[in-house]
Amino acid sequence: YRADMWKHFTAEMPELAKIPVVGTVGDKTFNAEQVVALNPDVIFIPVDLKDQYESDAKAKMDAAGIQTIYIDYHAEKLESHQKSIEAIGKALGKEERAAEISKFYTDRVTRVLDRVSKINKPKPTVYLEVGMNGPEEFGNSFSSNYSWGALATMAGADVITKDVIKKTSPINPEFILEKNPDIIMIMGS
């Protein structure tokens, strides 16, 4: 899925290449039997994939005694991030470290949101796209309440795809030309 990143990570840390590939829930390559064979104590699943995971694999995890914890980072809500950090810390026996991370993160987000709230000028219109497919193919854009779109909205942007995308999806190039956004951001993944 992110072969370019994997190539760089494994170049720096070759031992990563020894980690078994178990697939992903989102593209239905998740291999529950392989996960069970690895005998983990816990599995973390993005809350966005809860329905698919529960229909495809959760019963197998439950039968094997593997705890499932749902985490939520894509809605970009501070409270969801705090709860996810806390749940991960608790599951790993690192509650103190999780509390430190949550406090650091909360302080930084609060600082940015406070500054944004003091800006008194029109919001720039913004188009966001994950351009990991290269220039030949349009990547996913985001609604104003999901992932990069939610972050841009919190930072004071008016995301042009807010009314046409529910979460994330490629957008018709004509739409972008028609909206003529003030800012176009093409990001990596």
Range-by-range predicted roles:
Residues 148-151, 168-189:
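Ligand-binding pocket segment of bilobal, Venus flytrap-like solute-binding proteins
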Residues 39, 65, 156, 180-181:
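Residue-level detector of structured alpha->beta connecting loops
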Residues 1, 42-46, 68-71, 124-130, ...:
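Structural recognition of the beta-strand scaffold that forms the well-ordered cores
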Residues 53, 57-136, 158-161, 170:
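Extracytoplasmic substrate-binding proteins
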Residues 1-37, 42-50:
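A short, structured surface patch at a secondary-structure boundary
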Residues 2, 47-50, 73-76, 144-145:
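Short coil/turn segments
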Residues 33-36, 59, 174:
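Alpha-helical segments flanking ligand/cofactor-binding loops in enzyme cores
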Residues 26, 140-167:
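Alpha-helical, coiled-coil/dimerization segments enriched in small aliphatic residues
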